[in-house]
């Protein structure tokens, strides 16, 4: 992949860009195999590659410059702004949206936030595309509600120019820190969730719910989990840290009892909507802390699926799962180092199969799926 920003040194986010893509994949696989060497993996499956360009469905743009000439992209530590509207990681459908948004910022009078002066209102634009329908979710991250009336008044023009904007919201982030979003989300459009679909499974993305940024690889990850679980002939399953339900909804059958747990109420609302649309009768999604839920339950499911944040599932949940001893644990991780640590604590489980998914090309990061069976 060629990137003019990388060549000039103005953006080095893709740290492995100079490394040939096959070498990227082999280096990631070697890193994973080294980490899991103590765990005697029975079967390694081939790496799931990614497209090398236009694979991201989400843009997180810092807004800088002036209200008349806004810049969308990133800020270096010295305050230098870099416009990333032509970043090759984004699909070609993003650039026309960015062009209109620059005009809209001026029309609505949304003054970009100046980090050095601590003045201005508009901090970030967060844009997510549905690969199913080509529609978008747009979030304006504002310092306060001061410009909210102006934003609402100017929205009809924006919706006329960009009818593909399905969900529009304002997030209020008042803190002078490099934090992407605050707690308050104000829905400005009729729709509150972006419709998506992977492998004939309907999924919904609300503004504050987590969703994978590489749809092609995410679809392969979910399909693989579905296929592995189908081979096991299980009747009950927990999906912990379930997000909008992507894993559980793929794995659930009409007769399986599925319980999905996620701390985000917004994500749970999306998961419930998908389950209802699929007609699943034995599925329950709850907005709870995954560790607290699991350690408070007496029943033992056949399989526990975990998809934790980068820190992993942690000692408390590892200890409880070891005592509870479900037949299988399916572990999806975006940080193989924390997963390897958790696997060490799950000493009474052996790794049946492992597969790497290249969710983040041109970086050292990747996703990994591991099936564990009680020894």
Curated annotation (Swiss-Prot):
Binding residues annotated for [4Fe-4S] cluster, in chain numbering: 3, 11, 14, 87
Active-site residue list: 334 (nucleophile)
SUPFAM superfamilies in UniProt: S-adenosyl-L-methionine-dependent methyltransferases
EC number: 2.1.1.189
Leader peptide range in chain numbering: none
GO biological process: rRNA base methylation
Broad class of enzyme this protein falls into: transferase
GO molecular function: 4 iron, 4 sulfur cluster binding; iron ion binding; rRNA (uridine-C5-)-methyltransferase activity
Amino acids binding S-adenosyl-L-methionine: 212, 241, 262, 307
Alphabetical UniProt keywords: 4Fe-4S, Iron, Iron-sulfur, Metal-binding, Methyltransferase, rRNA processing, S-adenosyl-L-methionine, Transferase
Catalytic reaction equation(s): uridine(747) in 23S rRNA + S-adenosyl-L-methionine = 5-methyluridine(747) in 23S rRNA + S-adenosyl-L-homocysteine + H(+)
Pfam family, one: tRNA_U5-meth_tr
Role played: Catalyzes the formation of 5-methyl-uridine at position 747 (m5U747) in 23S rRNA.
NCBIfam families linked: meth_trns_rumB
Family note: Belongs to the class I-like SAM-binding methyltransferase superfamily. RNA M5U methyltransferase family. RlmC subfamily.
PANTHER family from the UniProt entry: RNA M5U METHYLTRANSFERASE, TRNA (URACIL(54)-C(5))-METHYLTRANSFERASE
Protein name in UniProt: 23S rRNA (uracil(747)-C(5))-methyltransferase RlmC
Provenance organism: Pectobacterium atrosepticum (strain SCRI 1043 / ATCC BAA-672)
Chain's gene name: rlmC
